[in-house]
Amino acid sequence: WILLLGLRHLRPTVFTAANSALDAGGVVGEHKFQALAPLQHNAPDLAAVCTRIAAGDGPLRHTAALRFAEVHGYPVVLKPDIGQRGRGVFIARNAAAVHDYLARFNGAVIAQQYIDGDEFGIFIARMPDQPQVQVLSIVHKTFPQVTGDGQRSLQQLILDDARARLIADTLFARWAEDLQRVPDSGESIALVEIGAHCRGSLFLDATARVTPALVATLTRLADAVPGYAFGRLDLRAPSIEHLQRGDGLRVLELNGVTAESAHIYHPGTPLLVGYAAMFRQWALAFRVGAARARDGAPVTGPVELLRRFVTDLARARQWF
């Protein structure tokens, strides 16, 4: 389908022009901080405060991360500046965890303020002549949790939970030191804290929750990042009601062209419905990219895209 669209538009990678705010349109290998920096400068009320810590293995990295945590408090989110699908994302709750993370990963890192609340992924698109963004998809990311009964261990609670046992190996590694602990009766334990489907989050379709107030806030957000016109915003809000009012939103990441309209992962969504959504998304990506290319946005060529994919495969070995 992508090849067909490329032939139709006579430029196979014109979709990369949809997001000049990100390297190669955010297809692969983009720097997350490239879009987060202008957002927190131009619309600080919509951003989770973050800073970029340069690659290396010297003590200055540790000092910078600890200083950030001292100012903004724990927990602090640490993640690769270049990364995808939640790989390498870690929530550090103390200085020892910060030191351990930086010792294991010496690439460029983003330290970000931890934002509590409900997490959402909102896919937006905008043609050059549109005054407001259009919302293609909203997904409500929920995190599996178990409740203790005073009898079963955490390991058994995980195995007895229909959702949690599907990712038991991941959860066992995450909770290795607590698996034999018996939670108190009524004690609730959030097993996952990172909003990535591959990390165990459950994605629920919330597209019907879109409101004019939300669209207005998302438009202001897009205006704060020049060149950002097509992609998924991962953000948190105090509640879904706050989201609908466009109130209290804090962006965690701005993803590019290859991000997915994640509502397709809603449990029970037919496969053909998911494919249809992705076909529509890619058709729109080409239209937005072509329109912005005509306005002068840069297009990344096929050879450069291939190089980026190869580099990304090698980079993935560093993540944990």
Which residues make up each language-model segment?
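Coil-to-beta-strand transition motifs
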Residues: G117-E119, P128-Q134, G227-F230, Q244-L249, ...
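A transmembrane-helix-recognition feature enriched in membrane-embedded lipid enzymes
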Residues: W1-S20
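C-terminal active-site "lid" helix and adjoining low-complexity regulatory extension at the edge
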Residues: P238-F320
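Short beta-turn/strand-loop junction motif enriched in small, turn-promoting residues
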Residues: G107, M127, D223, P238-H242
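Active-site nucleotide/adenylate-binding loops and adjacent lid/helix of ATP-dependent enzymes
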Residues: A21, H31-A173, T211-V215
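A short glycine-rich, hydrophobically flanked beta-strand micro-motif that places a catalytic Asp/Glu
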Residues: Q113, G121-F123, Y228-H242
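A short acidic, glycine-rich active-site loop
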Residues: A24-V27
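ATP-dependent carboxylate/phosphate-activation module, predominantly the ATP-grasp catalytic core
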Residues: A125-V225, N255-G256, E260-A285
